[in-house]
């Protein structure tokens, strides 16, 4: 049974920026399920895509791994020999809780948990890279360099799975999808106070891009084959494949 997210249930006089501290880590599974539509579907599909695209003797990266849900999904599906997973998160409480969580599952696939800024991590010999609702927390000026480094570190035929909250350039559509997401949170038991306070806490730390911006960035990095494979309201996931003839 997960601890219920009540972080923003009472009025907070001095509301600071949202951060992945011990308090958030304690309620994160409940928070993510009640806040991100389609999250479980995305996690399941990450495992299936890893099974299809992982290459023998390669590395798989979970960048911004939080509690290791995507890491465990990949590990559970892998059958290729010699694969290693590197799971990275900047939050010390997240990494420690992920370590405890992953240790509860038996697997022959080794996982290296790394506490670091994903912008400082070398991507090498990769067949699968996952950015699952992570890029939106990266400094916008650093995003292109990160995507380029991922492309360069992927083997030909490797994939990037990029899940994000999207901003839409058509204003009426964007407004509608925002409202539908708020309805989703209300239906999951969040009060207007909780929704408002969390939105304000996230304002300075989570900056979303449009689908067009993501597509352009991926194209510029060298991903010729890329598109949206999942969407629910203003949340979704993209897949980008490095051509088998790419260097």
From Swiss-Prot:
Keywords, alphabetical: S-adenosyl-L-methionine, Transferase
InterPro entries reported in the protein's UniProt record: CmoA, Methyltransf_25, SAM-dependent_MTases_sf
Function in brief: Catalyzes the conversion of S-adenosyl-L-methionine (SAM) to carboxy-S-adenosyl-L-methionine (Cx-SAM).
Xref: Pfam families: Methyltransf_25
Protein name: Carboxy-S-adenosyl-L-methionine synthase
Coiled-coil residue spans: none
Transmembrane parts of this sequence: none
Keyword Transferase among UniProt keywords: yes
Subunit description: Homodimer.
Reactions catalysed: prephenate + S-adenosyl-L-methionine = carboxy-S-adenosyl-L-methionine + 3-phenylpyruvate + H2O
NCBIfam families, sorted: carboxy-S-adenosyl-L-methionine synthase CmoA (TIGR00740), PRK15451.1 (NF011995)
Keyword Ribosomal protein: no
GO biological process, one term: tRNA wobble uridine modification
Residues noted as binding S-adenosyl-L-methionine in the record, renumbered to the chain: 39, 64-66, 117-118, 132, 199
A GO molecular function held by the record: carboxyl- or carbamoyltransferase activity
Assigned EC number: 2.1.3.-
Family indicated by similarity: Belongs to the class I-like SAM-binding methyltransferase superfamily. Cx-SAM synthase family.
């Amino acid at each position: 049974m997960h601890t219920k997210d009540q972080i923003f249930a009472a009025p907070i006089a001095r509301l600071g920026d949202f951060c992945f501290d011990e308090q958030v880590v304690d309620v994160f599974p409940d928070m993510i399920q009640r806040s991100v539509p389609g999250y479980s579907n995305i996690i399941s599909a990450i495992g299936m895509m890893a099974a299809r695209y992982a290459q023998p003797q390669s590395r798989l990266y979970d960048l911004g791994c939080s509690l290791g849900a995507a890491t465990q999904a990949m590990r559970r599906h892998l059958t290729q020999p010699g694969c290693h997973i590197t799971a990275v998160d900047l939050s010390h409480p997240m990494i420690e809780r992920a370590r405890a969580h992953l240790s509860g599952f038996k697997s022959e696939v080794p996982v290296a948990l790394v506490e670091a800024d994903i912008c400082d991590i070398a991507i090498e010999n990769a067949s699968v890279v996952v950015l699952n609702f992570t890029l939106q927390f990266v400094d916008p000026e650093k995003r292109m360099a990160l995507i380029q480094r991922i492309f360069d570190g992927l083997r030909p035929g490797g994939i990037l799975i990029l899940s994000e909250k999207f901003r839409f350039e058509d204003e009426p559509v964007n407004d509608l999808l925002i409202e539908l997401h708020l309805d989703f949170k209300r239906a999951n038991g969040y009060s207007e106070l909780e929704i408002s306070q969390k939105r304000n806490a996230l304002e300075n730390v989570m900056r979303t891009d449009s689908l067009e911006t993501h597509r352009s960035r991926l194209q510029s990095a060298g991903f010729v084959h890329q598109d949206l494979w999942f969407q629910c309201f203003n949340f979704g996931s993209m897949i980008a494949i490095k051509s088998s003839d790419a260097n």
